[in-house]
Amino acid sequence: DIDAMVLRDRNHPSVFCWSIGNEVIERKKLEVITTAKRLAEHVHRLDPSRPVTSALTTWDKDWEIFDPLAAVHDIVGYNYQLHRAESDHERVPSRIIMQTESYPRDAFRNWDLVNKHPYIIGDFVWTALDYLGESSIGRAYYKGREKDGFHTGQLYPWHGAYCGDIDLTGLRKPISHYRDML
C-alpha cells in the first residue's frame, strides 16, 4: 500500500509529507516503534524529498511514552494535544510538531501557537464536512445530557458526525465563518 501511495502521488504538488499512521491502538508496544521505523525508512527510500509523520493521541497521563515512537518521525503529529507542545519542546527541543487533528473551537488557540513557535508547523481541523459514521460526535445537546451519545453507546437518534464546517446538505455552519476570520 505504501509503495502504491508514494509512487502514485510523489509528484503531486499538494503532498508535502507522508503519514504512516493515525492513532495506532498498540502505540505503547515496542513493536510499534520498530514497525514505524521500518515504514519511515521505506517511505524515505521511495521519496527522500518529503518528511514522514503519523498522528499520535492519548488522554492518558503518560504522554511521554510516545517519545521513542515520535523520534522515528520527521514531524510528530498531535491529535487534539497541541496544548502539550510547549512542554514537549522543553523536553525534546529538536521535535517538529504538526497538529494533525483538532477541534474547530480550538482554531484560534492553535494558530496562536503555530504563529508563536517555529517548531509548530500547522494545524488540521477534524473535519471539513459532516459525515456518516462516529455517530453523535459534534452534536448539540441539552444541559445535563452531555454524556449521552458517542462515548456511552447512547447513539439514537444520531446517524452521523456533526463536527464539520459544512453540513451533510452542503451548507456552511457558523464555525466555518469563525475560522474565516482567523
Can you describe what each PLM-predicted range is?
Residues D1-L182:
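Extended substrate-binding grooves/exosites of carbohydrate-active enzymes
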